[in-house]
Amino acid sequence: MTTAAESLATWAAGVDPAALAPSVVHAAKRCVLDAVACALAGADMPWVERVLAVARAQGSPSRASVLGRASRMSAPLAALVNGTAVHALDYDDDPAACHIGAVVIPVALGLGQALRIAPPRMIAAVVLGYDVTTRIGEAIDADLLYQKGYHPTSVCGVFGAAAAAAYLHGLDAATTTHALGIAGSFSSGNMEFLADGAMTKRLQPGKAAHDSILAAELAHAGLTGPRSILDGRYGVWRYTETRDDARFTHGLGTRFAVQEVYVKKHASCLGNAPALDGVLDLMHAQRIAPAQIREIRVGVRVSTLAMVGEPREIRERPQTMLDAQMSLPYSLAVAMLDGEAGIAQFAPDRLGDPRILGLAERIHVYAHPDLATAKAGNLTCYLDLDTTDGRHFTERLETYRGHPRSPMTDEEMEAKFRRCASLRIAAERVSAASEAIWNLDKLADLSPLLAAITG
């Protein structure tokens, strides 16, 4: 009997770059653009610096570049640093309740450089990496992973990135299955960083990226992994005691996850996005000033409440950048004052601003009964806003800018890239990097891109 891992491996090993539709290739390039943008913006964050210092100390062969720097190291260690950097500001994509780009794209870029892979094949690795991660996340319901304390980004992402790494190494279906089995031994990461804003939140995608390359290379060397790693008696499906075979296999090879990506407009937890867009739009349309806000109530799913509304004392008065990014009260308050919730709004020197904290105290997040059975990825919220002059507004917000049903345009993606990349590299290199990514499928190798974003 064919196992779930074997089904994925057979498909992934046989992906033909030339057979991918232009729309799929374009979607993958958008994912690369966003991941590189986030990595460059996050390159100087303290948690990235710490991971980089440890990686440098390993004394590994210099085969892959660290984004935004002149450093080179082994592909696994470069993926560790770059994955941490992509996720350093919580500004990276978030499809299927997983930050897939932070795990898959550092692997594709690192191995693409180290193995001198043609860019079209690297793009195909991105496509299949997103697919494998998404299908596993959907099959076991990533929302249940959150509720049980697991971090879906690293738990599921290591499999997609391992499939991408195996593909770039040219492994056959049987060996790719072993790579997935080995990746299952590395599938880990938990949500306890929510308790005190610990840096491990940023690290876990990078660790999954590192481990995925190791899994593929161990399989390449002949190490075996369980073929039933997903659906076996002790497999990954047991993490949530659920499986959705229909979602796991539906449209394999015709429906592509890179075309269903949730791109972030705000440098804040994705669970905050509908309310952020809704409140900012409402304030603009009704000409409401921050000082006129009497109270805001936001009803969300139970799992969303646990991430962005609790514990209330931390969400109202965040102590770290991560505390603030995971806080709906803080995110809404700073956005109402500044008109946006970008990187600067979550800087440490903003966290004690009495104007922000005063507004945050007027924002209440609760579990809405109508969302009790909402599935992962459903970030619908109910918004009630009362003003000091007696006005009351009620809205049901189902989507946000960057959602697949309201996607950011290429121009918006480009603007985000330029804002982020300019924090690390000069303007002419920003333009060169952008041009290289948008034309990635036409390049002979990765050198034009790497020249712009490293060194």
Language model segments and positions:
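Amphipathic alpha-helical interface segments
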Residues: 101-105, 147-168, 178-247
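Short, well-structured alpha-helical segments that form the helix of a local strand-helix-strand
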Residues: 126, 130, 177-180, 431-434
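Terminal-appendage/accessory-domain detector
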Residues: 1-100, 200-210, 217-455
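Hydrophobic alpha-helical hairpins/lids featuring a short glycine-rich hinge
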Residues: 83, 87-140
